[in-house]
A protein has these predicted regions:
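Intracellular effector-coupling site of seven-transmembrane GPCRs
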Residues: 48-57, 205-248
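Intrinsically disordered regulatory tails of 7TM GPCRs
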Residues: 1, 37, 212-231, 291-331
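Seventh transmembrane helix
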Residues: 243-253, 266-312
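Extracellular TM2-ECL1-early TM3 structural module of rhodopsin-like
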Residues: 9-18, 46-109, 117
């Protein structure tokens, strides 16, 4: 069945889309509320600006895309059939492409921010501020919008996918311009994801080195805790995003290097995974919120601290006993 021009939904239930929509909206709102509460207790930072932008982008994705799918199921029409010239399909594809690019770009900037704050603190304090974060977010949005309007100018195309409630870039384009466009999209995702992973690994190595240097002095545990609070959610979200985007990148490269035979089931699985990251991101921040991390950090360090205290107590007791015996011998 050719789903490109299908106007009526052949089958399917809106329950999955409704659950995804509810989970995305509720999760992002809860995460934003918790972030605002934390911001009022502490001074706002560049990291908080970037996290807020990430959550707002995910919330925008849930609000702008999911209601369209629910409306399609309610009318029994596909995205192409909901408008005369497939405007709804183009709108849906534009949003999916924009949100995937902007979310990944923000994650990459967050990873770079963490690396600079730990690896190059002097440069970070001197040159980076919240204003840089606002400018960076604006530039990311602008660049993503410019890229996503290219299909309206003849580079690439937004097409409908099975079962008629999904629209995205044509991953099996036969024309050279379309292949270059979708190839650039996949390559950009691959490069930015690799940069994010490298930055996170570098931050992790720096934290391990800091921990080893400071364990012997029993100091700076507070700063270590704060860095772990920032790194753990970022690393988790990066893993989630890789799992959600890598299948789509692989599908694009397979279509570019192989035949142009359409595989609707594989394309649909890749698109569904792509939409999951905006739902999972806020729940990562909710579960790995700083208060919970502090509790876990204290519990992990309590056995070590108690062991150190017992060791100090035994040493002091042995020293006092030795001094007492020595004084008796002298007498």
């Amino acid at each position: 069945m050719d789903f490109l021009f299908l106007t009526f939904i052949p089958s399917g239930q809106p329950i999955t889309s409704a659950v995804m929509f509810s989970a995305g909206v509720v999760g992002n709102i809860m995460a934003l509320v918790l972030l605002e509460v934390r911001r009022r207790r502490t001074s706002p930072s560049l990291y908080h600006v970037l996290v807020t932008a990430l959550l707002m982008t995910d919330l925008l994705g849930s609000v702008s895309v999911s209601p369209v799918v629910l409306s399609a199921y309610a009318q029994g029409k596909t995205l192409v059939g909901m408008s005369a010239n497939a405007e709804v399909c183009s709108y849906f594809g534009f949003n999916m492409t924009f949100l995937s690019l902007s979310t990944l770009a923000i994650l990459c900037v967050m990873a770079l921010e963490r690396y600079l704050s730990i690896g190059h603190p002097y440069f970070y304090e001197r040159h980076l501020s919240k204003r840089c974060g606002y400018i960076t977010i604006a530039l990311i949005y602008l660049a993503c919008v410019i890229f996503c309007i290219a299909p309206f100018l003849g580079f690439g195309e937004y097409v409908q996918y099975c079962p008629g409630t999904w629209c995205f870039l044509d991953m099996s384009h036969a024309e050279v311009k379309g292949q270059v466009y979708i190839g650039f999209y996949a390559s950009f995702i691959l490069i930015v994801t690799s940069t994010t992973v490298v930055c996170n690994i570098a931050v992790l190595l720096l934290l391990v080195m800091m921990y080893r240097r400071r364990v012997s002095a029993h100091s700076a545990s507070r700063s270590m805790t704060e860095e772990v609070e920032h790194l753990l959610p970022l690393a988790t979200i990066t893993v989630v995003f890789i799992c959600c985007t890598l299948p789509l990148v692989l599908r694009v490269y397979v279509n570019l290097t192989g035949s142009h035979e359409e595989r609707h089931a594989a394309d649909l699985r890749a698109l569904r995974l792509l939409s999951f990251h905006s739902i999972l991101n806020p729940w990562v921040f909710i579960i790995l919120r700083p208060s919970l991390l502090k509790i876990l950090w204290r519990k992990l360090h309590k056995p070590q601290e108690s062991t150190l205290m017992r060791g100090k107590t035994l040493n002091s007791a042995q020293n006092s006993t030795g001094c007492h015996l020595q004084s008796n011998t002298t007498i």
